[in-house]
C-alpha cells in the first residue's frame, strides 16, 4: 500500500474521482439509513492521530471505522511522542507496522505528507492548516443532495479567505467546474499560490477573488467558517472589525437573487452565547454573533447539520477507496 492510496489534498484527484467519492458516500448513507451492515474490513485496525481538538472529524472517523468493521484507536497529542521524543518519520514507520490506516489532524501539511510517505499504509488528512479535504467531500455531497448537480452552480465563501476551508473550497470548486467566489477583505484573501493551484486544476467555471459583498447576488451556495482558526494568534478585536461586513445575516441574504440558495457552515459556529468562547467574546467586545447570525443559522440549520452528518458517510467512502484492495 503506497502514498497513492492516501487522501491528502483535493488537487491529487480529478473531477471524476471526486464525484466518485461523493457518489460512494451517498451509497454508504443509504446503507446506514436502511440499517444494512457494511463491515467490509473486519479485523483491520486504524489509528486516529489528533494534534488539534475535534468533534465532527473524530466522531465521523470513529463511527465510520466501526461501521466498516475496523478497530479504531485514538492517539491524542499527549498520548504519543509525535515530533517530541520521536521523529515523525520514525513514528510513521512504527505505526505502519501495527495499523492498516492512519488519520491525521494537525497543523503542518508536511506532517501528513510524511506520514503517508513513510508509514507504508493509507493516511487520511483530517485537517491541516492548509487543507481540509474530508470536509470537501461532505460539503459537495450536501450540494449534490440539494441541487442534484454541480453544473452552472455558483458558490460564495465569505470570511477569512486564507484559511484551510477557504483553500479547499476554492480548489475543489475549480476541479468540479463550479463558479467560486472568495469574498473577503484584501488582507484576508487567498495566497497567490492557492489561487494558482485552483486555476491549474480548473475544469470549468469562473474564479473570483473580491472584497465586494455585492458579489453574492447570483450565488447558489453561501459558505462561511469561524473567523479565527485553531492555533492562530491574532488581535481578535481587529479580526472582528475586519470581518463583520462579511457576516452572513438576513440583510446579506436579501441581496441574493436565488430564492433557494443553500447556506453552509463546517462548524463549530459562533452564532449565539451558548459557548464559553461566545460568552467571552460578548463580554470583551459586545458581539453576540460573529460569522453568521443566529436567525440565519436556525433557518438553515437542517442543511448545516445535514452537512455535518455527511462527514460520516464521506469518510467511509474515502477509507473504503483506500482499503478495498488491501
UniProtKB/Swiss-Prot annotation:
E.C. number(s) listed in UniProt: 2.1.3.3
GO molecular function, one term: ornithine carbamoyltransferase activity
One GO cellular component term: cytoplasm
Keywords: Amino-acid biosynthesis, Arginine biosynthesis, Cytoplasm, Transferase
Principal location: cytoplasm
Chemical reaction(s) catalysed: carbamoyl phosphate + L-ornithine = L-citrulline + phosphate + H(+)
Residues annotated as binding carbamoyl phosphate: 54-57, 81, 105, 132-135, 266-267, 311
Pathway the protein acts in: Amino-acid biosynthesis; L-arginine biosynthesis; L-arginine from L-ornithine and carbamoyl phosphate: step 1/3
Pfam families: OTCace (PF00185), OTCace_N (PF02729)
Organism of derivation: Streptococcus mutans serotype c (strain ATCC 700610 / UA159)
BP GO terms, sorted: arginine biosynthetic process via ornithine; citrulline biosynthetic process; L-arginine biosynthetic process
Protein name: Ornithine carbamoyltransferase
Binding site for L-ornithine: 164, 225, 229-230
Subcellular location: Cytoplasm
